[in-house]
Amino acid sequence: MGTGIIVCGLNGSGKSTLGKALAKRLDFYFIDNEDLYFPKMDNQYPYASPRTYEEAKNLLFHEIKVHENFVFASVKGNYGKEISPFFQLVVLIDVAKDVRMQRVRSRSFQKFGNRMLPGGDLYDQEEKFFVFVESRAEN
């Protein structure tokens, strides 16, 4: 069995950024939970067709089997007892909510521009996401 590292943190904490850098430094494969859930099927809105939990879990299992040395970025990584043995190391990133929310909104604007602002076609969807992110428990 190789080495699996999970980088956890709430939305906007920097887990993907840190995970990618760590994977590059260690020459490990990088897996982002967001990529498991959201296939790049719609160039206009990449979150349009989310996969189910089971589909994402199966994809993660596949990635782990193919790439035994990996870094996995996920809010919690809660994929059950079957996955836990593949993680040898855990990194938990804790960032203040105001900083995280600023990063999440900034990232949304970078991806979607004016489409996520009032009057834009993605405004309602993104605002719902911001409310969800802000409501997440910090423990």
Positions of PLM-derived features:
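P-loop (Walker A) phosphate-binding loop of NTP-binding proteins
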Residues: 10
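Conserved substrate/cofactor phosphate-moiety recognition/catalytic segment
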Residues: 20, 24-65
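A glycine- and Lys/Arg-enriched "phosphate-lid" helix/loop adjacent to the NTP-binding pocket
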Residues: 89, 94-139
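Walker A/P-loop
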Residues: 16
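Hydrophobic anchor at the beta1->P-loop junction of P-loop NTPases
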Residues: 7
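Walker A (P-loop) ATP-phosphate-binding motif of ABC ATPase nucleotide-binding domains
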Residues: 4
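Glycine-rich phosphate-binding loop used to anchor ATP phosphates in small-molecule kinases
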Residues: 51-98
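ATP-binding Walker
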Residues: 13
